[in-house]
Amino acid sequence: MRVRLGALAGAAALSGALSFVLLAAAIGTDFWYIIDTERLERSSQRMRDQGPANRSQQEPLSSHSGLWRTCRVQSSCTPLMNPFWQENVTVSDSSRQLLTMHGTFVILLPLSLIVMVFGGMTGFLSFLLRAHLLLLLTGILFLFGAMVTLTGISIYIAYSAVAFREAVCLLEERALLDQVDIRFGWSLALGWISFVSELLTGVVFLAAARALSLSQRQDQAI
């Protein structure tokens, strides 16, 4: 039983650390949402070549965005509007909805990191002290953190859909969107992998709590 408990401790430590690193990397990078305008720019370039001579070159419009800022290909990154200042500015209802959603996921995802830190500390103590209730509490903590991560990611996806619809409504030439590639980036993929790993960590801690409980019952029976 000691061997099994040690294996569970190693698996929990590995998956927990992986989840923390991946989520921290996802939060800190700017490839959650990618807008690729290369096809549109090539089409515009062909039209300019067929027209009067014009040596001016249009700046690329492609961009990639994170939770905090958006970055253009040949320009510096610009921060997104602070969602916690919405009471001080006059915005439309749809824009206020976007700000509320933005403020929600920028709180939830870092909160999941904090939960994992506390879970890591209680998890270390629970294996060190072989405490059944502490193992159980740690498992519940990681499962709660996984749900927080899932909620944050889901709200971000919904936020992106609402922002896209808002942009379509404001765009006069909607046919141009057919030549623009819009997709989620690898930062979001890191967030999903972190969620799965965090969920697995919680399950491993619950399994360790059950294994320790069975071991203690067997020892008492002897």
Curated annotation (Swiss-Prot):
It is found in: Cell junction, Tight junction; Lateral cell membrane; Apical cell membrane. GO terms for cellular component: apical plasma membrane; apicolateral plasma membrane. Keywords: Cell junction, Cell membrane, Glycoprotein, Membrane, Tight junction, Transmembrane, Transmembrane helix. It is a multi-pass membrane protein. InterPro entries: PMP22/EMP/MP20/Claudin, TMEM114/TMEM235. It holds the Pfam family Claudin_2. Glycans are attached at N54, N88. The chain crosses the membrane at residues 7-27, 105-125, 133-153, 188-208. This is Transmembrane protein 114. It comes from Mus musculus (Mouse). The lineage of its organism: Eukaryota, Metazoa, Chordata, Craniata, Vertebrata. The gene is Tmem114.
